[in-house]
């Protein structure tokens, strides 16, 4: 028994240390799989020895029985709110009051010169909580409530992964109350809403609501499954002082295992506070969590005590708020716009309101499912949210303010642009050889390029920088060309005459000739650029590159069956069907034929089948992709090893099949191929793969055909002989992965003039660094043209 108890204590200590390194220091020392192994070992030992389970064990974060209600908790030291600053003048006034309150006339010394030192940290947009530790163990968690009385949420805070159940180290007071914010990261919020949608559950308007709703669950098992995090920002009651400054307090708490903001900083005077505010304001949208301002506190704790409090807020702290990202306004109407693929999308027309410093009159509604989820009606009062460059969106309806004359939102039966019929899309779910059809969220105009809106967006996409890269064709010019009926498809761009262009608004002789040259220069695109330019639904730039690299010819891409396309990396069955359907469409084929025929486009980089694709096409892979009920990858491998060919599997007798697989799986295979449609489909897939030059091998091969396969390259600084996009394409054609960040896994860094921190890090890690000349030489050696 002693050995078991010792092992349990060892595991707890080790897991606590790893939790500390992961959540507080952000320096994980072991992979997740090893952490999971240790965790499950501890969990198993505690299950066998329940009398050894303690409340501070890492296993005790999974939640307990649901409560009927939260009990009330009185805060020994009130959790007060902070005063707010909205303008720089408010901060200057705050600093003046602090200086006068400390009786510090100009020229007197305090810390550094006559300036007051302030701690600076982001104001997290979450839920304030109090954590009470006795003898280093967490004994209670409570919400802020009204500042005097909160709710006991102890069982819930114990499930938050980065809240220590027992403090690290030693020297902590007998009684220690830590205060901070429970919040949800942006990524965690997106994951939560996605999972809620999948199960038909409630979604949340923003991360703050999600954090608050998750933390105040009566069933702590629900809280345990929510991606909550904690960041401490100060102390409540303590039985002993732990530092002389606020930053000293936080640094000490960090040593004891408490997560502290990575953005914590000391400012020497109010001007440095304003610099901090501006800096973090510029970086606000790049942070992994949402903040609604910055909190400044007098750093010296003795000075804090001297300044004291007024009403319900401290005189020594202030929250400098950012402009609001959410506002209330009225929904005046819902109009519908038509996109490149014909999607008819609702757009909210709003009573203009200022959100995050910008006047907003329109907001996206995504689709009619979103309108239904919100319960939105014209005339409603709604909450609008805007974050940086993100299009403003309606996140919530204030139902209690709905007027009596509110109207339902109706989808138009005909396209608002061209008058064509509008139909609701269908979603086809394919699994285990069966198809399930459900209504989609998107409504679509069937007018295709006869619809002016679709034509304009299709041309804008076709000429864009990452597609055909035709300079001089801006959105307004394309609108003119379409409105004047000078173009009716991408192919018509190549038929434009000088006389037609010079008559357009904004064009003269030089600009007209430059545009004609840019159009002519686009006649030799790479296969990847051309595929992307076609605007195939769900096919972005990276998928287009995969198609080009793997199949290496437009004919193969056009002919490829959906199941064949799923052999490609990151191409799932639904996307494969979108690609296949696009090339099956007669209208799309006519446009492509015109581009490659009368327009004279010549696609580059076509040739032999890609080595990566060739290595992935195995017989067991084909069997697995047929989605035979009860037959997974393991059974598929057994069939491939036993029979060697598809025809042998189809024609195998019962005895052979039964010797290979258990009865249930054997029967499933026989039943599947007894359906002639299934057998013929499998033969068609195999025939196409063989037409592409494949032959079966029972084992998956390592890709060796591409000289830079498995290598990660990074481009930094500027290049003179070619753009970074072109350099990236050429490296990727050789099998390299081109990343935006340098790490120990990086193989080579290409550094041009202006290279900064990435080059510094590469040198620190001892990585191979090439200049542009060395890159061009390397590409030439590998047979890639660089001119």
Swiss-Prot record:
EC number: 6.5.1.2
Entry-linked CDD domains: BRCT_DNA_ligase_like, LIGANc
Gene3D superfamilies named in the record: 5' to 3' exonuclease, C-terminal subdomain (1.10.150.20), 6.20.10.30, BRCT domain (3.40.50.10190), DNA ligase/mRNA capping enzyme (3.30.470.30), Helix hairpin bin (1.10.287.610), Nucleic acid-binding proteins (2.40.50.140)
Top EC class, one word: ligase
Top-rank lineage group of the source organism: Bacteria
Cofactor(s) listed in the protein's UniProt record: Mg(2+); Mn(2+)
Residues annotated as binding Zn(2+): 415, 418, 445, 451
One Pfam family, short name: HHH_5
Membrane-spanning segments: none
An example Gene Ontology CC term for this record: cytosol
Binding site for NAD(+): 32-36, 81-82, 121, 144, 181, 297, 321
Keywords (A to Z) from UniProt: DNA damage, DNA repair, DNA replication, Ligase, Magnesium, Manganese, Metal-binding, NAD, Zinc
Catalytic activity line of the entry: NAD(+) + (deoxyribonucleotide)n-3'-hydroxyl + 5'-phospho-(deoxyribonucleotide)m = (deoxyribonucleotide)n+m + AMP + beta-nicotinamide D-nucleotide
Active site: 123 (n6-amp-lysine intermediate)
Cited PANTHER family: CHROMOSOME TRANSMISSION FIDELITY FACTOR 18, DNA LIGASE
Family label: Belongs to the NAD-dependent DNA ligase family. LigA subfamily.
Family annotation (NCBIfam families): dnlj (TIGR00575), PRK07956.1 (NF005932)
Protein name stated in the entry: DNA ligase
Organism annotation: Pseudomonas savastanoi pv. phaseolicola (strain 1448A / Race 6) (Pseudomonas syringae pv. phaseolicola (strain 1448A / Race 6))
Gene: ligA
